[in-house]
Regions:
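N-terminal beta-alpha supersecondary unit
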Residues: 3-82
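Short beta-strand scaffold segments in enzyme catalytic cores
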Residues: 15-20, 137, 145-149
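Conserved phosphate-binding/catalytic loops in two-lobed NTP-binding clefts
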Residues: 108-109, 288-312
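Conserved phosphate-binding catalytic cores of ATP/NTP-utilizing and phosphoryl-transfer enzymes
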Residues: 109-135, 316
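Glycine-rich phosphate-binding loop plus the immediately following alpha-helix
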Residues: 113, 150-194, 223-226
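Glycine-rich phosphate-binding/hydrolytic loop that grips phosphoryl groups
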Residues: 115-117, 301-339
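A contiguous, well-structured pocket-lining segment that forms one wall/lid of small-molecule binding clefts
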Residues: 190-271, 280-294, 321-324
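Conserved small/polar residues in nucleotide/adenosyl-binding loops
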Residues: 344-350
Length: 353
């Protein structure tokens, strides 16, 4: 009998559903929310309302594209955290009702684990080379910047992480200071391709170990702009592409410096990148350069698997299903939770759902 998993993702502002059958992706549907662009960032209440409107048609479309009826499902996997509580509750509540009505198990998935295991998403006829354990994964997004030692599907260790702002968060905030649109990351990426990455210099953190810090870079960028604009009020407009390229290059240098140290310290040559910022052209180029210079075997996900999506939730759910790792129907959502931590003993804020 086939194992068919429905994955549901609703941690932030993308409503997504996907179907995995025996480890192969059959469908992945994502509904994004343009409503937040006018506010320059995600508005939690608006995101939650949009999820409520989108969740049913998105799941229906995912099943339709997969050619699967709901009665054929083996389990429902859902993002339990981290994320925006109002958004998470929509996905968690739907998953509970859907699974209960079908009499099938529920599988809770850590959103961050899903990003890491996105490297194992594969579709029929798709040439997808997957990393072998153990490997290093740089997980970098708007909310997280971590270096992870991936020992197995269900065994991961955080070697280093940001002690303040995440890389994507710093880029978005600097983009906002420049008066660019939302989300800032893709806009900075596009502008950077036309600019000189060595045009401007911004401060880099000097902290021990493998942890990251991006708050200093954000402050350096802000103060530098303030000083330059005293002499030229239109400085940003005159140097937009060079500013973007220099900012991007600084972020990438910070990320790759600690990743190089981790690869050397743990003697690992298989290195992956995951998360929304992994779509950044500068970061991808840096990975390719390091592959040639240090003999790394690198793994860069498809663009469609870098941002939030249910395919990564479904594949993680599939691996957990094979281990019979289910969760109770009363499982709550968690807005804040770290990677590779058992939900059982958490005392973080929860919902009653």
């Amino acid at each position: 009998m086939s194992t068919i998993i429905l994955g549901i993702e609703s941690s932030c502002d993308d409503t997504s559903a996907a179907v995995i059958k025996d480890g192969y992706l059959l469908s992945n549907v994502v509904a994004s929310q343009a409503v937040h662009e006018a506010y320059g960032g995600v508005v939690p209440e608006l995101a939650s309302r949009a999820h409520q409107q989108n969740i049913v048609p998105v799941v229906h479309e995912a099943l339709k594209r997969a050619g699967i009826t709901k009665e054929e499902l083996s389990a429902v996997a859902f993002t339990r955290g981290p994320g925006l509580m109002g958004s998470l509750l929509v996905g968690v509540s739907f998953a509970k009702g859907f699974a209960r009505s079908l009499g099938i198990p529920m599988i809770d998935v850590n959103h961050l684990t899903g990003h890491v295991l996105a490297h194992f998403i594969k579709a029929e006829g798709e040439d997808n080379v997957q990393p072998e354990f153990p490997f290093l994964c740089l997980l970098v997004s708007g909310g997280n910047s971590q270096i992870i030692l991936v020992k197995a599907y269900n065994d991961m260790e955080i070697l280093g992480q940001t002690i303040d702002d995440a890389a994507g968060e710093a880029i978005d905030k600097c983009s906002k200071v420049m008066g660019l649109g939302y989300p800032g990351g893709p806009i900075i990426d596009k502008l950077a391709r036309q600019g000189n990455p060595k045009a401007f210099s911004f401060s880099k953190p000097h902290i021990p170990g493998l942890d990251y810090s991006f708050s200093g870079l954000k402050t350096s960028f802000l103060y530098s702009l303030r000083d330059w604009m005293k002499d030229d009020p239109d400085f940003i407009e005159h140097h937009k592409t060079d500013l973007a390229a220099s900012l991007e290059a600084t972020v990438v240098d910070i990320l790759m410096d600690k990743l190089r140290k981790a690869a050397k310290q743990y003697k690992i040559k298989e290195v992956a990148v995951a998360g929304g910022v992994s779509a950044n052209n500068g970061l991808r180029n840096a990975f390719r350069e390091h592959a040639g210079k240090y003999g790394w075997k690198i793994f860069i996900p498809k663009f469609s698997y870098t941002t939030d999506n249910a395919a990564m939730i479904a594949i993680t759910g599939y691996f957990k299903y094979m281990d019979k790792d289910f969760c109770p129907m009363e499982a709550p959502a968690y807005s804040r939770v770290t990677l590779a931590v058992s939900y059982t003993h958490l005392t973080l804020p929860t919902s009653d759902l």
